[in-house]
Amino acid sequence: SKKVDVGFLPPTAYTLAHDQKAADVLLQAQRFGVNKDGSDSKELTKDYKSEILVKKDSGIKSVKDLKGKKIALQDVTSTAGYTFPLVELDKEGVNVLKDMKVVNMKGHDQAVISLMNGDVDAAAVFNDARKIVKKDEPKVFDETKILKLTKPIPNDTISVRSDMDSKFRDKLKKAFKDIAKTKEGHKVISEVYSHENYVDSKDENFDIVREYDKKVKEMK
C-alpha cells in the first residue's frame, strides 16, 4: 500500500520492506555509544551491539559453557535480543535452539531482571541494557558480566516509499537533520526514539541484517 510516505523502521523491518521494493533507506539514527561501565559515551554512533550477560559467580567463562543452560531471549523479530545473539553463538558452536533452554521475555529490562533473580543463566540484550534496570537493581554491574559482544547492528532507519522522487527525498533528509539540531526537535526524538541525530545511509549497511536473518531461518 502507498499510504505511508515516511517511516521509522528498525533494521529487520527495513530490509523486509526494501526487498519487497516498498521502501528505501534515507537516514540512519545516531545514538550515544556505550562505555565499558555501561554509561553513555560522548561519541555518537550509527550502530550498537548486542551482549550476552551472565552472573559473575555463575562459573560460565566461555560461550561453550552455555550448553544446557537457560537463556532469556526477546521475540524472534528482535535484532539484538534474538537474531544477532543466535547467529554469533552458533558460530562458536552453541546452537541456542538445540543446546539451550530458551525463555522468552517481553523487554530487555525483564531479561536482565530474570538473570539477576536467577531465573535464567544468561540474557541476550542490547549493550548496555543493564543501565535501564540499575535504579531497581543497583548491584547489576557488580554482579553480572558481558560474556560476549556481537558485531555492530545498524541503528533504526528513516525510510521512504521506494517511488518517492529524489527532490522530495533531499527535502526530507534536510528536514530531519534540521529537526535534530533544534532544541525542541532534539528533545522529542531523544525522548521518544532515543535518537540523537541523523546521518545519510545506504542499503548495503543492512546486508549483515539480511545475512543474519537468513542464518537464523536455516538454524530452525
Language-model features: where?
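Hydrophobic residues within well-ordered alpha-helices
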Residues: S1, L66, L115-M116, L172
